[in-house]
Amino acid sequence: MPRFLILFCLICAVSFFPVAAAAQTQGAAQGSAAAYFERGKNQMADENWYSAVESFLECLRLNPAHAEGTASLAECYYELAEFDEALNWVRKAKQLARTNMSVANLEVFILIALGQLDAASSLVNEILAKEPYNRETLFAAGELDIARNRPSEAMLRYRDAVRRYPDDRRLLISLALVTLSLGDGDTATAYINSALLQHPGEYRVYYYAAYIYSMNNKITEAIGFADRSLYYKPDYAPSRSLMAVLRYRNGEYEEAARLCDVIIAGNRQDMSAWYLKGLSLIRMNRNQDAITILTTAVSVNEEDEFIRAVLEETLLSSTTLEDPRRARFAMWHFNKARNYRQRNLIEQALFEYRRGLRMNPFAADRREYAELLRLSGYPARYLEELRFLQDQGVADRVINDAVEAYGSLLSNALFKQWQVNPVDLAERHWKIAVFSLAGQSSFYHADAGSVAAGVIRELLVHDRNITPMNMDLRQAVFSQAFRHARESGADYFVLVSVTENERDISIKAEAFVGRTGSPAGIFYTYRTGVDRLRDASRGIVTQLSASLPIRGRLLIRKQGQALINKGKADGIQQDTVYDVVKRGRMQTANEGIAIIYSSDELVGKLTITNVDEEIAIGALARNGFFDRIEPGDEVILQAKKTKPAENTANPELRSLLRTLR
């Protein structure tokens, strides 16, 4: 009997041991998963997102069903702007915790960041139907309004939420930011002061206070708030970057450059710090040092448009035409132009060729630019470019043959029939000054408005109807811009401003009448991705050009026919009817973009019958009994009234709200 009892006990012990061992292993794994989760949460609190991702991934390796770890991993990817991956993980978390409203709210924020606004709206409504006063959902609903470019609705929503939660830091800051974006700086200041009063030791509140005060041009106070933010959290990168910008805007260029060195030492990929250091050196008249710094920055990220724009402007203003660095940076544009041309992106290729030729006008690559003009349907301009190459002594047999062939081909062109030279007859009828107010800085780039204004002015050079006036882009205040534009005889002047985040840019161009300073029009563009500065600037130029009446001059009259100095390249179309106005009698309207003249000054009509590349002819019809049409009279086509471009969601505001923790 004892032998059977001993055998039975041994069998039970052997059978139970694997189960106990497995249970012990599982418990240890769960304990380790919990430890990794806690470590990840602490790293999130320190905003150490990369380490937090590592901890949560290890947590989920040990316990794949850890709902909070899954949700936290999704939040980390959201903070790292990896929104697709964040959505993947938050939906896994949702399956593990279907009733968790925090997970549902996180999904809303991710959907908004991905631009899936309808899906985000449906989820917001679903949550509010269950919990009408869910604080996080109310915050998300306001961000959704901003994404849909409804800042007024967002302000009302945040204001209502603040009444329910008057001490909520995020709501107060959000309300301050949205109010500021609507132009109410005083109210925005009141809200951020309330947040400061209720959260006196919170470094993030001081950071946003510094931003809001800086946008109200209260730079000294803003520096104080940024300093307090760094006092409470010395390694807070956004406050350090903002402090560098504030020192720059306050004229403390040496200190701004020093802070940029600190930022670059910590993160060599911080392109805004390279950019700001280059600007600071330029303001200190250390152009060669600035060129060195910006050249290094371009080697770190050659696609940064702001750095390249400032670098090229500095090279143009402080080096000779023979400087080899010009040819080097011009070649970058030529290579990019060839890439666009291979993909049949003609407008983009033309832009890059022009940028390159601006740096190195005698480059042999002008030949490729000429060929692109020919393919675009401008043989006369193609011939002009080839003759320029001949004049420079860089023509070969192929170019010489092409000049001869196209010279013969154009022998029957209108300008030959009327025995005129289109190059000598070309005339730009609009004078436009492009400015940016000196205090206009975006969240990512100081003086962003003046950089964008420079790109816009360069693009206007290639508009055959517009003379962009060569004046200082940075103007201290509106009155100074108005005075300079008026005294220089500008028809209109434009003030450019920029808002941006790490991926998107929005440019606003406000046009004013040069004579009166009255508003003339507002133009908006929004672009995202690579080349966004270039594309957004082109959008502004396209809108501005389309809003201006077409103007030309009657050059030669032969009985009922007349030749004008505008053609296909200027947008002249066959069968279009133009007003013929007495020379020197028209003037710009006191407000808006228009030309005004009396019926007595309207001496006739011109119907276009034949359009050449740079000139056109048409049939004349007099206005009234007497024929008063003379060479030198102006030919005008009032621009069609088009629906102005709508302002898009403020990318800078969206970024500030998205990163608000």
Place the predicted regions along the sequence by residue.
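Register position in tetratricopeptide repeats
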Residues: 45-46, 79-80, 113-114, 147-148, ...
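Alpha-helical segment of the N-proximal tetratricopeptide repeat
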Residues: 31-62, 79, 113, 140-147, ...
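Canonical tetratricopeptide repeat
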Residues: 38, 72, 106, 140, ...
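Helix-start (N-cap) detector for alpha-helical repeat units in TPR-like alpha-solenoids
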Residues: 33-34, 67-68, 101-102, 135-136, ...
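Short coil turns that delineate tetratricopeptide repeat
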Residues: 30, 64, 98, 132, ...
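Surface-exposed, polar/charged interaction patches used for macromolecular assembly or partner binding
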Residues: 193, 197, 224-227, 231, ...
